[in-house]
Amino acid sequence: MTADTAGTVFPAETVLSDGSVYRVVPVGAGVRAIRAWAEYPWPMSPAQALALRDRLGWTSSLTNERMFTTDHGIGEKDVSFNTIEAGGDTRTVSSFHLSLTSRIPKPVRAEAVPTAGRAFDAYVEALTAVYGQGKRSRNRGVLSVTWTLPSDTLVDIGTVGRVVSVDVDSPVGNEIARGEAQYFAEIADENDPAR
């Protein structure tokens, strides 16, 4: 299966028993968006993130320019990015989040789980074709696959129940996360009564 054919494995829209529609971003479109952000030459300023948004034809929220609506057809704000201080008044993009499935009413969420599972598998297969084998894990019910790119950008796709989403963490975000993990590991060692 390729990124172009993966979308045929599951329906992009499923009408649920209450009449609501569960939508899944077609794999080809989702993978193109993921790659646009993950393969960007980091660091990325907020202005560069907004320019990438415009190049992709996405629309900012009226209340928060860091939240977008894509043309992927799920009918809601489905993208956001976060920034961190990069020194002085300068900010840099630390992460990007893309929802690959729509929100649906709670009473019918279980109906979407099989479709979400097939979508997750199709996305993992398509991203594996691009980035090679990722690291699979499960934490607190969230099944995820993570790829660390040569740039130290991290791509993480996860699913829990009817939700499928992807996060792209910038190299600077990964460096901060490693530093925090090391700090907390050292604190734990210092506070270990067995030492």
Which residues are covered by each model-predicted region?
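Active-site beta-strand termini and strand-to-loop segments that position acidic
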Residues: 147-151
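Short helix/turn-capping signatures at newly exposed starts of structured segments
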Residues: 1-141, 152-154, 159-195
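Short hydrophobic/aromatic beta-strand element in the GNAT-like acyltransferase core
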Residues: 144
